Amino acid sequence: FDGCSGLKQVIFPNTLKEIGDYAFRSCPELITAVLPQGVEQLGKYAFAGSGLKTILIPHSVYWIGEGAYADCKRLNHVTVPDNIVSIPDRMFSGCDSLSEIKLPETADRIGSGVFENCSSLQSIVIPESVRSIGENAFGETHPKFTLLCHRLSEAERYARNHNITFQIIY
């Protein structure tokens, strides 16, 4: 369905286990794609450039490919389930309407460019479990952007090294 400009909705069977690489990339009218419990993998750029506004990734997903939701211009709310430990490179890059995201408390890695060009994102809580943050993970941050992080965490170190405004949380 890559590049299917008229696709508006997808209903997946409950038996679906994997969404392939580029499966729904560049489907700008796709605003509804409810992933069933049982889906385990989301391929690279699977929904990149789609019209999705909100995503809820099922707890059954254990692997997400690079850029899975990149350039989703309407996307504004995301919840990533606790079983995802690595937020892949460029997962949400270019999602300029993204204003709210909940990262799992179990995340240990935030990839490169994950939140690059997410101009509506004003703050993000970085779990204490994060041990690695990739280059340009937050791109060019705007003046009101704040990383909410734990004292002496990797996120605090990253914020200091990249001149990103941060606030210590407990």
Where are these regions (language model features)?
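Consensus positions within tandem repeat domains that build extended binding/scaffold surfaces
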Residues: 2, 20-25, 43-46, 65-68, ...
